[in-house]
Amino acid sequence: MFNANLIKAITLDLDDTLWPVWPTIYKAEDLMREFLQPHAPKTVDFFANKESIASLRKKLIQDNPHFAIDLNTLRKTSIHEVLSMHQEPLELVDPAFEVFIQARQQVDLFADSFDALKRLSSKYKIVALSNGNANVFGMEIGQFFHDAVSAVQAGVAKPDAKIFNLAIDKTGFQAHEILHVGDDAHLDAKA
């Protein structure tokens, strides 16, 4: 039986729990394409075609299954592949990725997220637990987090118990003293 009085820490999903993820991703992709446009217009056209890029990413994940949890490497490899495919400058891979990942951290929190984190962090240790590549410590809300665990760190994605166990270890508490909050009933509740 659940006893809220036992809770000492909260593990917290990020994307679509604290902010809507897709507007952030779309804006980051737009900024990356703007950066690439003067130097790699064919690459920009390819990235603008959602079916083409989805097909490429699917193939990359089939060939490299770890890319399914390592979204940064997947994105860098995608950029490299598309630049190479169109014989455009490969030295754009790292700066294009940096434009994307910096914009990826510019999230628009849901209206109550900041105040809720502030209030909760005064009573509980909060650990970010995400399959994504957002870095809470690069955001204003980072001050409310004790630690963060990503799928890349754990070597597995939610709902695998290993990622939850790593987050439990980061809190220093036992599993029954931790509440997980997320937006996905399958990914955030199975373990």
Per-range role (PLM):
Residues N3-A111:
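N-terminal helical cap/lid subdomain that shapes the substrate entry/recognition surface
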Residues A4-I7, K123, A175-E177:
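A general structural motif
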Residues A191:
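Hydrophobic/aromatic ligand-binding patch that stacks against planar heteroaromatic rings
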Residues V127, G132-L179, A185-L187:
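Substrate-recognition "cap/lid" segment bordering the active-site pocket of phosphatases
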Residues D30, E34, S122, D169:
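Short, well-ordered alpha-helices that flank and scaffold nucleotide-derived cofactor binding pockets
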Residues I10, E91-V152:
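Substrate-recognition element of Asp-dependent hydrolases with the DxDx(T/V) motif
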Residues D13-D15, P20, N131, D183, ...:
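Acidic active-site catalytic centers that drive phospho-/nucleotidyl reactions
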